[in-house]
Curated annotation (Swiss-Prot):
Cytoplasmic side stretches: 1-33, 341-377
GO cellular component terms given for this protein: COPII-coated ER to Golgi transport vesicle; endoplasmic reticulum membrane; endoplasmic reticulum-Golgi intermediate compartment membrane; Golgi apparatus; nucleus
Key word Transmembrane present: yes
Name listed for the protein in its UniProt record: Endoplasmic reticulum-Golgi intermediate compartment protein 2
Lumenal topological intervals: 55-319
Family: Belongs to the ERGIC family.
GO biological process: endoplasmic reticulum to Golgi vesicle-mediated transport; retrograde vesicle-mediated transport, Golgi to endoplasmic reticulum
Function: Possible role in transport between endoplasmic reticulum and Golgi.
Transmembrane segments: 34-54, 320-340
Record key words, sorted: Cytoplasm, Endoplasmic reticulum, ER-Golgi transport, Golgi apparatus, Membrane, Nucleus, Transmembrane, Transmembrane helix, Transport
Source taxonomy: Eukaryota, Metazoa, Chordata, Craniata, Vertebrata
Pfam family, one: COPIIcoated_ERV
Annotated gene: ERGIC2
Record text on subunit structure and interactions: May form a heteromeric complex composed of ERGIC1, ERGIC2 and ERGIC3. Interacts with ERGIC3, the interaction is required for the stable expression of both proteins. May interact with EEF1A1.
């Protein structure tokens, strides 16, 4: 009884077979079919290689949410060279809460030579070229995010020559921690001193003819310092054409959380608008000579996550490629063969075999016998 039930079960399973086997003796091969098969296998191989390269690649996913962190401090990373001696300039930050952050809290004043060496000029040229490409091709920013901590540092390389020229500039570099409110980082004449109504700079002690706010921004970023990330103002160089010249940068800072397979960092992106003008009180152009970077923080936070195609999706796409090519090439081969047979007059519903002679009862023969099924009487 068990054997009978087992046979019935096997018979039922065989009837459900969706892949019936055709005996090889019933299969007819042809040159056209072999050619189509070669084309199909070649196409499948190429598409499989391309699909595998897509599977190995990653992409960046952007998500937006409201920034709810108001209590933490904002870090400003600075590396600026000004074409004035260090004793003549001062840098500090003053925010909307009238909180002053002095440069002594984290900035270093280092005498330097404003003109770059040949190697440094080449570095600056490449950085400016990269900046121009980033402004045209925004998708390159994803490549920069993925290459963080893997690419070479974007910092200005040290001078390779021992220049005998005396320092004529001041390199101000380091970092400051400020409140997460709008503020103004500025470099102007004279050291800053606090007073009840804000702060002031001792500009009266500096000769007006020594004013020169030509400057080069080697690096400016907000948040955690991430090597190999190129920021909008990196490599910027401005040459002053007048002693009383003001350079203004209006910066909008966007908090950014970066999560890749290599790093995870809380940093900030920013956009900038530049403006420069000559101070002339007689002409109505009021202000103070110097470099002013006015920043404001966006209320939105961006989360950038590196993602990868899951294996199951890669497998499904691969099956789709193989099955689709087999079905499509088989259908196209059948249609093509059908058309060729019609054009060449080889398509026929039956088989025609001519009969040389058919004898009649009276002894005559007729060589023109009409077509009969199987040519039989």
């Amino acid at each position: 009884m068990r054997r009978l039930n087992r046979k019935k079960t096997l018979s039922l399973v065989k009837e459900l077979d969706a892949f019936p086997k055709v005996p090889e003796s019933y299969v007819e091969t042809s040159a056209s079919g072999g050619t189509v098969s070669l084309i199909a296998f070649t196409t499948m191989a190429l598409l499989t290689i391309m699909e595998f390269s897509v599977y190995q690649d990653t992409w960046m996913k952007y998500e937006y949410e409201v920034d709810k962190d108001f209590s933490s401090k904002l870090r400003i990373n600075i590396d600026i060279t000004v074409a004035m001696k260090c004793q003549y300039v001062g840098a500090d930050v003053l925010d909307l809460a009238e909180t002053m952050v002095a440069s002594a809290d984290g900035l270093v004043y280092e005498p330097a030579v404003f003109d770059l060496s040949p190697q440094q000029k080449e570095w600056q040229r490449m950085l400016q070229l990269t900046q121009s490409r980033l402004q045209e091709e925004h998708s390159l920013q994803d490549v920069i995010f993925k290459s963080a901590f893997k690419s070479a540092s974007t910092a200005l390389p040290p001078r390779e020559d021992d220049s005998s020229q005396s320092p004529d500039a001041c390199r101000i570099h380091g970092h400051l921690y400020v409140n997460k409110v709008a503020g103004n980082f500025h470099i102007t004449v004279g050291k800053a001193i606090p007073h009840p109504r804000g702060h002031a700079h001792l500009a009266a002690l500096v000769n007006h003819e020594s004013y020169n706010f030509s400057h080069r921004i080697d690096h400016l970023s907000f948040g955690e310092l991430v090597p190999a990330i190129i920021n909008p103002l990196d490599g910027t160089e401005k040459i002053a054409i007048d002693h009383n010249q003001m350079f203004q940068y209006f910066i909008t800072v966007v908090p950014t959380k970066l999560h890749t397979y290599k790093i995870s960092a809380d940093t900030h992106q920013f956009s900038v608008t530049e403006r420069e003008r000559i101070i002339n009180h007689a002409a109505g152009s009021h202000g103070v000579s110097g470099i002013f970077m006015k920043y404001d923080l966006s209320s939105l936070m961006v989360t950038v996550t590196e993602e990868h195609m899951p294996f199951w999706q890669f497998f499904v796409r691969l099956c789709g490629i193989v099955g689709g090519i087999f079905s499509t090439t088989g259908m196209l081969h059948g249609i093509g063969k059908f058309i060729v047979e019609i054009i060449c007059c080889r398509f026929r519903l039956g088989s025609y075999k001519p009969v040389n002679s058919v004898p009649f009862e009276d002894g005559h023969t007729d060589n023109h016998l009409p077509l009969l099924e199987n040519n039989t009487h």
